[in-house]
């Protein structure tokens, strides 16, 4: 599973667990991106922090491991380089690349897109409220792609960062160890005023 993981959250972990069970995978390898070219328009936390948060978040699951293949490679991170490196390291393995269906819809904009499907099968995880464009879906080779419906956890890394920057809790959105890591290193300093638009007129029942 490739991703920026800035930060990693329970949505990532549930998706990985569901796909592992669906395909009876021996392991799920989490691959934090080094320098994500798609996100050059915003600040991204240092790769080492994102790697360590991923290690913390996945430590309890014996089928989860974390790779440094992308963060130890210099230059922008491209999926084609990730898969070539993993294929060289694991020549006998059948590789499945797990990503969100929104990212999958853009796959033909990725570097050396045609070669990607020769290196791995792709698993597109559905997200709450997201419908993949039929035209985009029609361009993807169905024998190399599987769409998997994931239990609806409406969590995103963007929301976790913004909550932290507003001084709001991220408990139960990210693993406990990641909450403590964020606090220790103050990765997302408070810069946004608290959200005062919430309806607090009724007590929770």
UniProtKB/Swiss-Prot annotation:
Belongs to the NadD family. It comes from Nocardioides sp. (strain ATCC BAA-499 / JS614). SUPFAM superfamilies: Nucleotidylyl transferase. The keyword Transferase applies. PANTHER family: NICOTINATE-NUCLEOTIDE ADENYLYLTRANSFERASE-RELATED, PHOSPHOPANTETHEINE ADENYLYLTRANSFERASE. Catalyzes the reversible adenylation of nicotinate mononucleotide (NaMN) to nicotinic acid adenine dinucleotide (NaAD). GO terms for molecular function: ATP binding; nicotinate-nucleotide adenylyltransferase activity. This is Probable nicotinate-nucleotide adenylyltransferase. The gene is nadD. Disulfide bonds: none annotated. Pathway: Cofactor biosynthesis; NAD(+) biosynthesis; deamido-NAD(+) from nicotinate D-ribonucleotide: step 1/1.
